Amino acid sequence: MLLEHLLIILWMQLTWVSGQQLNQSPQSMFIQEGEDVSMNCTSSSIFNTWLWYKQEPGEGPVLLIALYKAGELTSNGRLTAQFGITRKDSFLNISASIPSDVGIYFCAGQ
């Protein structure tokens, strides 16, 4: 019998460019184990680098994926991130979510 776990993935905003605003969506989500998850960051400014982090309770942020080129698509296990062609957005996808995916996810542009 397969147990389904309710996962809560929360994320917040982080930007490294003074005065720049990043918009992330969704702000929070509830998903079932095994579901795919998509998150995105957008900005009115152009960035040369997009970074995705995860922070678990009681821990510091950990870099998951760094993107350096417009249009770049990078995978790391079940994680896939893309740097938008316009250099104003980035997307993070988690396939087949598992309970250890619960955490706070940050995007950063610089």
Curated annotation (Swiss-Prot):
Gene3D superfamilies: Immunoglobulins. SMART domains: IGv. The keyword Transcription does not apply. It comes from the Eukaryota. The keyword ATP-binding does not apply. One of its GO terms (cellular component) is T cell receptor complex. PROSITE patterns: IG_LIKE. Residues 1-19 form the signal peptide. Residues 20-110 form the Ig-like domain. Disulfide bonds join 41-107. GO terms for biological process: adaptive immune response; response to bacterium. Its main location: membrane. It holds the Pfam family V-set. Glycans are attached at residues 40, 93. It is found in: Cell membrane. V region of the variable domain of T cell receptor (TR) alpha chain that participates in the antigen recognition. Alpha-beta T cell receptors are antigen specific receptors which are essential to the immune response and are present on the cell surface of T lymphocytes. Recognize peptide-major histocompatibility (MH) (pMH) complexes that are displayed by antigen presenting cells (APC), a prerequisite for efficient T cell adaptive immunity against pathogens. Alpha-beta TR is a heterodimer composed of an alpha and beta chain; disulfide-linked. The alpha-beta TR is associated with the transmembrane signaling CD3 coreceptor proteins to form the TR-CD3 (TcR or TCR). The assembly of alpha-beta TR heterodimers with CD3 occurs in the endoplasmic reticulum where a single alpha-beta TR heterodimer associates with one CD3D-CD3E heterodimer, one CD3G-CD3E heterodimer and one CD247 homodimer forming a stable octameric structure. CD3D-CD3E and CD3G-CD3E heterodimers preferentially associate with TR alpha and TR beta chains, respectively. This is T cell receptor alpha variable 35.
